[in-house]
From Swiss-Prot:
Gene, per the UniProt record: yidC
Keyword Protein transport: yes
Protein name in the entry: Membrane protein insertase YidC
Keyword line: Cell inner membrane, Cell membrane, Chaperone, Membrane, Protein transport, Transmembrane, Transmembrane helix, Transport
Pfam families for this protein: 60KD_IMP, YidC_periplas
Length: 541
């Protein structure tokens, strides 16, 4: 009976977890921000000088043939010479669909959807202000390619203002990397001092996340400051209030499942992280850097970095010690991080993510074996006490208080913990939840094949074979546990339906997670047989 109740407890905890994470995604209140960091849209101008996406961009300049194209081993980028905005970015090494040659496009600007990275110079003498429009840069050519044997590729753009000041904007691309350096060089050849301020922002059409209860994912903004290591800023929150947070260093990003774009200004600079939603339905998040005063005859360099690529924790950590937090494992991150490390460790040896998941399942089950043994031992003792418990029920009848006292005395006398069977399950659930988020968030599993019909561990089984096998394994586990005659009929019914309910739930789960659960069930069945054999020798059945 105790074992049956434990299986029922697993089911209830599992369903509760799904409902809780859906509530977190939809209804959970965001942290209360200080008055200085968030202000109402109606009463603030987040950055009066920061231009809108298309301000000052002639229609003719948006034609594909006028864009500057850049090709590296990792990125296929298009830059609009008006302003020098990145208006297109395809990830060459990451395909849109498995087995197809079409690369995954992260940034683009189409008739119905905008997702671009904008940067420029604002301030008193800025060349990209909302009032003056955008600077029309000139380039030596319109096509740049990272050649074989070349580690970096520079794309210089030049603009000469009416006062004779030369502004050079250089994009520096790196082999094997998804980050781009954006460097401004300002040569003040005028007779007057200049005052400029760099900004960078990401603009995206507000679009709902392709999320579900089974695979909750986040699409929206996020930022980091010296006081807030990592915080999501949902589109609906951006529509209600503007972010305006002074900080040293920091970063601003747009997130979606597996991929991220982010502005990372220098960590030693004084910046302001800001956000807004424009009238055209564009969500904006970015940074404004320090104000620079440039004396006549002086030259000033201002730099920042932009990342556009997968949520690769190693690459992100190299840019900022908090940018890797965009791989969000939730409240059990402290448990998920070592699990992810172990998963990567196994994969580096076996070269197959499915086999790595099996190995980590065996590891987890092996580490939890003492708890599992204690669980079944406690359940066996409880079963042996059933005749005595039944005798207490008959003796005390409806007097629940006396019967409860007698039961506690019996447990104490027989050295049985009535919660002994539940505690190991409660300890195992956090591990399952942490692994769930690791498999959901780790971009390494995107398009990662296993074997046979499983070609992508990050999506559901196309033929539902793994979920059906998982349900069958639950049915076997259930049948190995006899139903006690004293068990409530309603509980019996719920237990009989539990494998079916779990199978239905797991139909839409990533096949990597179903594989973990299936292998875990098989190992549990084997462990159960081994433990029961030992208990029978001790007279516990």
């Amino acid at each position: 009976m105790e074992s049956q109740r434990n299986i029922l407890l697993i089911g209830l905890l599992f369903v509760s977890f799904l409902l809780w994470q859906q509530w977190q995604a939809d209804k959970a209140p965001k942290p209360v921000a200080t008055e200085s960091s968030v202000v109402a849209n109606a009463t603030t101008n987040h950055s009066a000088d920061v231009p809108e996406a298309d301000t000052g961009v002639p229609a003719a300049m948006t034609a594909t043939q006028n864009l500057i194209t850049v090709k590296t081993d990792q990125l296929d980028v298009q830059i609009n010479p008006v302003g020098g905005d990145i208006v297109f970015a395809a990830l060459v090494s990451h395909k849109l669909e498995q087995g197809k040659d079409q690369p995954f496009v992260l940034l683009e600007q189409t008739k119905d959807f905008t997702y671009i990275a904008q940067s420029g110079l604002i301030g008193r003498d800025g060349i990209d202000s909302s009032a003056k429009g955008r600077a029309a840069f000139a380039a030596s050519k319109t096509e740049f390619t990272l050649a074989d044997g070349q580690d970096t590729l520079e794309v210089p753009l030049t603009y000469v203002a009416d006062n004779g000041v030369t502004y050079t904007k250089v994009f520096v691309f790196h082999r094997g990397k998804f980050n781009v350096d954006i460097d401004y060089k300002i040569n003040n050849t005028s007779a007057a001092p200049l005052q400029v301020q760099m900004y960078g922002q990401i603009k995206q059409t507000i679009k709902p996340s392709e999320s579900s209860m089974m695979m909750p994912t986040y699409r929206g903004a996020a930022f980091s400051t010296q006081d807030v290591r990592y915080e999501k800023y949902k589109f609906e929150d951006m529509s209600k209030s503007n972010l305006n947070q002074p900080t040293l260093g920091g970063w601003a990003a747009m997130l979606q499942h597996y991929f991220v774009s982010a502005w990372i200004p220098p960590a030693t600079d004084s910046n302001t992280i800001f956000s807004s939603v424009s009238a055209g339905g564009l969500a904006n998040i970015g940074f404004r850097g320090a104000v620079y005063d440039i004396a006549p005859g002086a030259t000033q360099e201002i730099s920042s970095q932009f990342y556009v690529g997968p949520k690769d924790q190693k690459a992100l950590s190299a840019l900022s010690d908090t940018l890797n937090l965009v791989v969000d494992y939730g409240f059990l991150w402290w448990l998920a991080v070592p699990i992810h490390w172990l998963l990567m460790f196994y994969q580096s040896f076996v070269g197959n993510w499915g086999v790595a998941i099996i190995l980590i399942t065996l590891t987890v089950r092996g580490l939890l074996f003492p708890l599992t043994k204690a669980q079944y031992t406690s359940m066996a003792k409880m079963r042996n006490l059933q005749p005595k418990l039944q005798d207490l029920k008959e003796r005390f009848g409806d007097d629940r208080q006396k019967m409860g006292q007698a039961m506690m005395e019996l447990y104490k006398k027989e050295k049985v913990n009535p919660m002994g069977g539940c505690l190991p399950i409660l300890l195992q659930m956090p591990i399952f939840i942490a692994l769930y988020w690791v498999l959901l968030e780790s971009f390494e599993l995107r398009h990662a094949p296993f074997m046979l019909w499983i070609h992508d561990l990050s999506v559901q089984d196309p033929y539902y074979i793994l979920p059906l096998l998982m349900g069958a394994s639950m049915f076997v586990m259930q049948k190995m546990q006899p139903i006690a005659p004293t068990m409530d009929p309603m509980q019996v019914k719920m237990m009989q339906w539990m494998p079916v309910i779990f199978t239905v739930f797991f139909l839409w789960f990533p096949s990597g997670l179903v594989l973990y659960w299936l292998v875990g069930n098989i190992v549990a069945i084997i462990q159960q047989k081994i433990i029961y054999a030992g208990l029978e020798k001790k007279g516990l059945k």
